[in-house]
A protein has these predicted regions:
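Bacterial N-terminal signal peptides
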Residues: 10-24
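Short, Lys/Arg- and Gly-enriched loop/turn segments at beta-strand edges
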Residues: 88-100, 139-150, 254-264, 356-358
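Intrinsically disordered, low-complexity linker/loop segments enriched in Gly/Pro
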Residues: 138-240
Length: 380
C-alpha cells in the first residue's frame, strides 16, 4: 500500500494508491441508475482484440485452482474477453436434479469446491508483484437459476442455520430475460443483479488453505475454490456487477484469470450456502496489467464507492482486516491528507462494512467508502 498520486494531480483525481487515473465524481443520475456495461466514468484504456472463451469440459475446472493447468486462452493487457460459464459440478446440476443428487455431487470432489471455473486465461505482461485490473463490462445470464441448502443433518456447519435445517431443499427458477427477473413464488419477484461469485487470479503460493490430496510441501499444489484469499477466488461480494472494477495482486506469471460460481442475485451473507446460482452466456471482462500499483488484498471500485476486503475463518478477524485496509487506504490517499486516527474515525462515521458471506469456511467482510463524501472538495 505504498502507491500515491502526484502532488500536482487535480482535486478530482481518483485519490488512491490503488487507482492511478483521473476519474470524475459520479453524477446523481449515475448513482441512481448506472447504465449496464457503461464505463464512461473509468480511466480510458485503448481496447485491443476481443476474444471468446466457451465453456467445455476442457476449459472449465471443477473445484480446484490448479496453477499448473494449461492456459485456455492467451490475451494482451487491455484486450476484452467474453467468457461462458457453467453451473456447479461441471454443469451436472440442472432443472430436475434432486437434493440427493446434489449431495452425491458434493461428496464426489472431497476437499474441492462445487464451483465450475472457466480458465485460466494468461494475460501477457502480468507478472508477480503487479496488480491485475479487471473491468466487468457485461453479464448475460443463461435461462435458469437455482438455490439450495444442503441437509444440516449431513452438513451441520454449512449454512448459518444448518443445525436448524436438517433437510436439504432445492428450487429452480426460469429467468425472464426481458424483465431480468425470476419469480420466487406468486407474489414475489426477484430482479436480477448478476455478479461473479468467483473472480480469481492464479494462487498465492503462501495461501494457508489445504491443498489437493493433503499435500503440505508443494506451494504450487492445487487450492480448493471454497475459500477467498489474496488472489480473490470465492469472494461472493455482490457489488461486483456490471460497471465495477476489481483490482487483484498477481502471484504467478500471466496472472492466470478464472471466473465462475456465477450468481444472478445474492444477499449479503449468502446465509443458506447458495445465492441465486446461475451460469452466464457471457461475462465480458477487460483485464489490464498494472505495474504502477501495489496491493496486498483485493480492492474494488464501483461508480459510487471504493471497497476494501477482509477474509478470515473468524468473522471478527475478517472485519478487523477489512477495516484495517480501509484505514490504511484513507491514510495514504493524497486527495485530502489525513492521519490513521482521522482515517479510523472516518471509516467509523461513513464506512459501510458488510458481511459478504459466512459459508465459505473463510468468511468475508467488505468495507464501502462512499465517493460522495469528497464531492464538495471536487467542486471547490
Amino acid at each position: 500500500m505504498n502507491r500515491s498520486i502526484p502532488a500536482s494531480a487535480s482535486i478530482g483525481a481518483l485519490f488512491a494508491i490503488f487507482v492511478a487515473s483521473i476519474v470524475p465524481a459520479p453524477s446523481a443520475a449515475q448513482q441512481k441508475s448506472p447504465a449496464r456495461g457503461n464505463h464512461d466514468w473509468a480511466p480510458k484504456v485503448a481496447s485491443g482484440k476481443h476474444h471468446t472463451l466457451a465453456a467445455s469440459l476442457d476449459t472449465v475446472q471443477w473445484g480446484w485452482l490448479d496453477p499448473r493447468e494449461k492456459p485456455k486462452l492467451t490475451i494482451n493487457s487491455g484486450d476484452t474477453v467474453s467468457i461462458e460459464t457453467m453451473m456447479h459440478a461441471h454443469d451436472k446440476i440442472q432443472p430436475g436434479t434432486t437434493m440427493e443428487q446434489v449431495v452425491e455431487l458434493r461428496k464426489a470432489n472431497p476437499g474441492g469446491g462445487p464451483h465450475s471455473l472457466t480458465g485460466p486465461i494468461y494475460v501477457n505482461g502480468a507478472e508477480p508483484g503487479d496488480v491485475l485490473e479487471i473491468r466487468i463490462l457485461r453479464i448475460e445470464p443463461k435461462a435458469w437459476a437455482t438455490n439450495f441448502n444442503l441437509p444440516g443433518k449431513d452438513f451441520p456447519t454449512i449454512g448459518a442455520l444448518a443445525a436448524e435445517m436438517p433437510e436439504g431443499h432445492i428450487k429452480f427458477f426460469p429467468i425472464d430475460a426481458q424483465k431480468r427477473a425470476v419469480e420466487f413464488k406468486p407474489g414475489i419477484r426477484i430482479d436480477l443483479q448478476p455478479f461473479p461469485g468467483t473472480l480469481a487470479v492464479g494462487i498465492d503460493p503462501n495461501d494457508p488453505s489445504p491443498r489437493k490430496g493433503g499435500v503440505k510441501d508443494d506451494p504450487m499444489a492445487p487450492v480448493s475454490t471454497l475459500r477467498p484469499w489474496k488472489n480473490g477466488s470465492n469472494m461472493d461480494i455482490n457489488e461486483l456487477q456490471e460497471g465495477t472494477t476489481l483490482f487483484i495482486p498477481v502471484f504467478l506469471q500471466g496472472g492466470l484469470l478464472w471466473t465462475g460460481d456465477s450468481h444472478c442475485r445474492q444477499g449479503n451473507g449468502e446465509v443458506n450456502l447458495t445465492a441465486l446460482e446461475c451460469s452466464y452466456k457471457e461475462i465480458r471482462l477487460q483485464p489490464i496489467a498494472r505495474k504502477d500499483m501495489k496491493l496486498n488484498w483485493p480492492f474494488i471500485e464501483t461508480r459510487t464507492h471504493w471497497i476494501t476486503t477482509g477474509f478470515n475463518e473468524d468473522l471478527n478477524v475478517a472485519m478487523t482486516n477489512a477495516v484495517r485496509e480501509a484505514v490504511e487506504w484513507l491514510a495514504n490517499q493524497k486527495l485530502v491528507p489525513m492521519d490513521r486516527y482521522e482515517a479510523y474515525g472516518l471509516v467509523s462515521m461513513v464506512g459501510d462494512c458488510r458481511v459478504s458471506q459466512v459459508v465459505d469456511v473463510r468468511k468475508g467482510v467488505h468495507c464501502m467508502i462512499p465517493k460522495s463524501i469528497f464531492s464538495d472538495q471536487k467542486k471547490s
